[in-house]
């Protein structure tokens, strides 16, 4: 019963903070959402981090990655939710991380049969295409086309990128 009460308190805190959020009190709400993340609640910790990111409340990539790692290492997430958090971490890091870090971030997803695997492969393909590493990009796009788990939308995006960039 104590666990249910704590869960309800965290839920109420998240709802209040997300509804009442305003830029004038950004520091207060940043603290509120970080407290929710520190609660290690499997529902609201990831949602709090996504709120902070989506509303551009966090300025430091280092802090964002620290909070991602805190959730990934300390929150008991369902497998696909954890893979979604990993994928989202990859998305956030794609603009500034070197390739070895990007692959390290996404490795747990691309080495699995997760729903998020094709999304991660597409992200890496786009990452390498943007960097001018066409063969690496093509390799990731090709993995999508041969995967059993690829949804039609991701399959079509990979196929279009191969046709557009490689004429195949």
Region spans (language model):
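Long, contiguous interaction/recruitment modules in multidomain scaffold/adaptor proteins
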Residues: 1-15, 34-35, 39-41
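Short helix-capping and inter-helix turn/linker motifs at the boundaries of alpha-helical repeat units
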Residues: 7-8, 24, 115
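Alpha-helical tetratricopeptide repeat
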Residues: 7-19, 46-50, 83-87, 121-122
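Amphipathic coiled-coil alpha-helices
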Residues: 13, 17-20, 29-32, 60, ...
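Extracytoplasmic/periplasmic/luminal assembly and interaction segments
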Residues: 24-76
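Soluble extracytoplasmic domains of inner/organellar membrane proteins
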Residues: 56, 65-168
């Amino acid at each position: 019963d104590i666990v249910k009460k704590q869960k309800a308190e965290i839920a109420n805190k998240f709802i209040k903070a997300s509804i009442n959020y305003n830029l004038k009190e950004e520091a207060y709400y940043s603290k509120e959402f970080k407290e929710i993340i520190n609660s290690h609640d499997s529902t609201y910790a990831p949602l709090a981090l996504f709120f902070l990111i989506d509303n551009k409340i966090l300025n430091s990539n280092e802090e964002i990655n620290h909070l991602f790692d805190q959730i990934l290492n300390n929150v008991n997430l369902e497998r696909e939710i954890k893979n979604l958090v990993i994928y989202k971490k990859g998305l956030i890091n794609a603009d500034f991380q070197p390739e070895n870090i990007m692959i390290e971030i996404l490795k747990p997803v691309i080495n699995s049969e997760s729903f998020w695997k094709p999304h991660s492969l597409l992200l890496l393909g786009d990452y390498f295409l943007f960097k001018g590493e066409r063969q690496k990009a093509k390799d990731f796009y090709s993995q999508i086309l041969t995967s059993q788990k690829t949804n039609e939308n991701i399959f079509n995006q990979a196929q279009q990128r191969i046709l557009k960039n490689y004429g195949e």
